UniProtKB/Swiss-Prot annotation:
CDD domains: lytB_ispH (cd13944). Binds 1 [4Fe-4S] cluster per subunit. [4Fe-4S] cluster binds at C14, C100, C192. Pathway: Isoprenoid biosynthesis; dimethylallyl diphosphate biosynthesis; dimethylallyl diphosphate from (2E)-4-hydroxy-3-methylbutenyl diphosphate: step 1/1; Isoprenoid biosynthesis; isopentenyl diphosphate biosynthesis via DXP pathway; isopentenyl diphosphate from 1-deoxy-D-xylulose 5-phosphate: step 6/6. Catalyzes the conversion of 1-hydroxy-2-methyl-2-(E)-butenyl 4-diphosphate (HMBPP) into a mixture of isopentenyl diphosphate (IPP) and dimethylallyl diphosphate (DMAPP). Acts in the terminal step of the DOXP/MEP pathway for isoprenoid precursor biosynthesis. This is 4-hydroxy-3-methylbut-2-enyl diphosphate reductase. Its cofactor is [4Fe-4S] cluster. Belongs to the IspH family. It catalyses: isopentenyl diphosphate + 2 oxidized [2Fe-2S]-[ferredoxin] + H2O = (2E)-4-hydroxy-3-methylbut-2-enyl diphosphate + 2 reduced [2Fe-2S]-[ferredoxin] + 2 H(+); dimethylallyl diphosphate + 2 oxidized [2Fe-2S]-[ferredoxin] + H2O = (2E)-4-hydroxy-3-methylbut-2-enyl diphosphate + 2 reduced [2Fe-2S]-[ferredoxin] + 2 H(+). Its EC number is 1.17.7.4. Dimethylallyl diphosphate binds at H43, H78, H128, S220, S221, N222, S266. Keywords: 4Fe-4S, Iron, Iron-sulfur, Isoprene biosynthesis, Metal-binding, Oxidoreductase. (2E)-4-hydroxy-3-methylbut-2-enyl diphosphate binds at H43, H78, H128, T164, S220, S221, N222, S266.
Amino acid sequence: MERNVILAKNAGFCFGVKRAVDEAIKYQKEFGKKIYTLGPLIHNNDVVNYLEDNDIFAIELSDTNSLNKGDVVLIRSHGVKESVIKDLTDKGLIVKNATCPYVTNIQLKVKKCYEQGYKIIIVGDENHPEVIGINGWCNDSAIITNGKTELENIPAKVCVVSQTTEKKETWNKVLNEIVKESKEIVAFNTICSATDVRQKSVQELSKEADLVFVIGGKNSSNTTKLYEICKKECPKSYHIENVKELDESLLEDESVKTIGITAGASTPDWIINEVISKIKEL
């Protein structure tokens, strides 16, 4: 049966993630030994396995106590608290920073505004490593909200930033709440421009598609948000990590004429292409 397969614009690796992966591989070759990343370099199991095959391993912060002086630790694209970088350096470790420049920009804005007496509000997931890291640049004092519950006791003087992968509608909702309560507001819409374009693109795609596959790690924040957006417009939207999770029975439905494909920022092209090729085979 003839089907139309549409790949969303900006699907797959974003600038920050690609940069982090390239940096990790570059440093492994440069030092010629194991490279350690604080947490998985990106939220994609297939890519993590690929990196391990190239002597690049994810560890937790507590594991750095077991490393030797001169071992190489790479800060991933999500970034870390300011204090973490100092602690690693004090241990005699070689620290390489692959924090996404967009995240670094948020960290520096937060630090500056915090020092100027602003209460920091972060719109995002309090358990996400990017948000945890940003909070560390204001002495872990930020108010963190995902927009699902109303903010209470909002200070009069606030600085508002967002997780780079947050949904635009959540940002707008929280900002509207703050405007009603605070007298002095410095707001930086720090949603990554690529994230914004990606979300708008999948929203349009899911309106015209009969079936949508969102490809990316189940632990990937931005992929999950893309899936949520797709599901609103197209009930037949499915979040899969790779071609192995492609449910072929979904393609037996003769009413499915147009299939939309999108992918999170941690999904490499080869995983996307495998899914598209499989769909076209069936």
